[in-house]
Structure formats: C-alpha cells, structure tokens
Amino acid sequence: MMDALEKYVDSLSTPESELLRALDHETHMQTIQPRMLSGHIQGKLLEMFVRMLRPRSILEIGTFTGYSALSMAAGLGEGATLDTIEVDDELEELAQRFFDRSPCGGKIRLHIGSALDIAPTLG
C-alpha cells in the first residue's frame, strides 16, 4: 500500500533535481544507514513549508548527508540562511561537497560537533 501511495505522490511532484538524485545515490553507496536520508517527497514537503513560512533563518540539527538542508535552502528567500549541525565528522566532506555544488549552497552553513555546544553560539 505504501509503495503505491509513494508512487502516486511522486508522480504528482516536481521531479527530483540532478544534484539531489546524485546525493541520494552517493548516500546509498557511501553510508551504512542510507535510510536516514530524507528523500525526494520529504524534501519537497520541507521546501514547500519553507516557501510558505518565509523564515529568515533555519536551524537543522542532524545534517546526515545534507539532502534536507539542500531541500530547505531551495525554499529560502534572499538573505535567509540555514545553519545545520552534524555530530558525525565523517559525513562533513560528502555534505559540504554537495552544498558547494548547489546554487543554494551559499545559504547553508555546516557545523560539525555537538548541537549542545554549537547551537548557543549561533546568532
């Protein structure tokens, strides 16, 4: 049932970008828990929420490989930023590489470490 529903929703959604498709593929190839990836439908939902709410800043705790951060950044307006915190330093290179390739990547600031330590330092 869920596969049919997911296929239906996917058929009505905007197609996944080449960049996000490549990130999905690399996440599945390079991580031991690729199911943690937000994915296309969840990413589009996050982007829609951001477009509707028009925040000036977003704090994401748990970057993983950056799919949700890229999705939310796509919905951010001019001058808005997204700070994303990831505790696993082994994921930094993969996430940052895709942030650097994205036209929205300049809106994203990746922080590596404990959210308990980093969040209070963010303005």
Please state what every model-predicted region is:
Residues 8-11, 25-26, 34, 46, ...:
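Short, flexible coil/linker segments at or flanking structured domains
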Residues 7, 35-36, 63-66:
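Residue-level preference for alpha-helix termini and adjacent loops
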Residues 1-20, 25, 30-31:
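N-terminal auxiliary segments of SAM/dcSAM-dependent transferases
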Residues 31-36, 57-58:
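A short glycine/serine-rich beta->alpha loop
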Residues 17-20, 33, 40, 79:
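A structure-centric signal for secondary-structure junctions around beta-strands
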Residues 40-123:
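S-adenosylmethionine/decaboxylated-SAM
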